[in-house]
UniProtKB/Swiss-Prot annotation:
Positions of post-translational N6,N6-dimethyllysine modification: K5, K10, K28
Name this protein carries in UniProt: Histone H3.2
Function, in words: Core component of nucleosome. Nucleosomes wrap and compact DNA into chromatin, limiting DNA accessibility to the cellular machineries which require DNA as a template. Histones thereby play a central role in transcription regulation, DNA repair, DNA replication and chromosomal stability. DNA accessibility is regulated via a complex set of post-translational modifications of histones, also called histone code, and nucleosome remodeling.
Stated family: Belongs to the histone H3 family.
DNA-binding as UniProt keyword: yes
Single GO MF descriptor: structural constituent of chromatin
Taxonomic lineage of the native organism: Eukaryota, Viridiplantae, Streptophyta, Embryophyta, Tracheophyta
Record PTM Phosphothreonine, positions in chain: T12
Keywords tagged on the record: Acetylation, Chromosome, DNA-binding, Methylation, Nucleosome core, Nucleus, Phosphoprotein
PROSITE patterns with a match to the protein in the record: HISTONE_H3_1, HISTONE_H3_2
Length: 136
């Protein structure tokens, strides 16, 4: 129950306080939202930290295979039409792409921490790439 500011009042008689106690008891026994229980919510950041631990423990690929394969084929079409890929080649490309992204996000996080922030921003990614020498 939310706290409210209490002001001093004159007591008018013996019956008023008893009535007030009865209403308080009734308020406590019945939920304020009409019997509908609110779903449990974790504090901001708790779920994010849990997900970080979960994904740092795991080794499986995080990008879905078919969308990544479509992207690879779409990019390859710009260089040569009717290219064929072995499934192991697409898997190797996906492993390399995910390893690159994980490393980039690690460096990006360090840039954000260096700027005394916990939230990464596009400028952190740009700085990380610039320091790596990927982008002049």
């Amino acid at each position: 129950m939310a706290r409210t500011k209490q002001t001093a009042r004159k007591s008018t008689g013996g019956k008023a306080p008893r009535k007030q106690l009865a209403t308080k008891a009734a308020r406590k026994s019945a939920p304020a939202t009409g019997g509908v229980k609110k779903p449990h919510r974790f504090r901001p950041g708790t779920v994010a930290l849990r997900e970080i631990r979960k994904y740092q423990k795991s080794t499986e690929l995080l990008i879905r295979k078919l969308p990544f394969q479509r992207l690879v084929r779409e990019i390859a079409q710009d260089f040569k039409t009717d290219l064929r890929f072995q499934s192991s080649a697409v898997s190797a490309l996906q492993e390399a792409a995910e390893a690159y992204l994980v490393g980039l996000f690690e460096d990006t996080n360090l840039c954000a921490i260096h700027a005394k922030r916990v939230t990464i921003m596009p400028k952190d990614i740009q700085l990380a790439r610039r320091i790596r020498g990927e982008r002049a």
